[in-house]
Amino acid sequence: MPRYLTQHTLACLTRQGAEALAQRMQTGEGARAERVLVNMVEGKLFGEFRADSRESLEAWLKKEGMHYDWAVRIEWETRDGKLAPAE
């Protein structure tokens, strides 16, 4: 299943609020976050998602009311120091 990286801007969200949002992202149906990274100082959240397609990810984010700045499919990644197709 393809992976996607998303960026979200957090407006006045507490650490507890960010944690609740991350938990929602990790239990989604149709799209599910494998990793969530947060910078509270800059108000940014990054999610690494598995989804069938970009369209299904975007539909899930919209259904959940989660605004995102951008979403990109992960096509390549480094493994053992070499660039390889993303799994």
Predicted ranges, named:
Residues 25-46:
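Short, glycine- and small/hydrophobic-rich beta-strand elements in well-ordered beta-sheets
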Residues 1-27, 39, 76-87:
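Short S/T/G/P-rich N-terminal loop/turn motif that feeds into the first structured element of a domain
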Residues 44, 62-63, 82:
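Context-gated lysine
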Residues 7, 48-50:
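Short hydrophobic/aromatic beta-strand micro-patches
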Residues 28-31, 52-78:
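An amphipathic, aromatic/His-enriched active-site/gating alpha helix that lines ligand/cofactor pockets
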Residues 1, 39-42, 53, 61:
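Short linear sequence motifs
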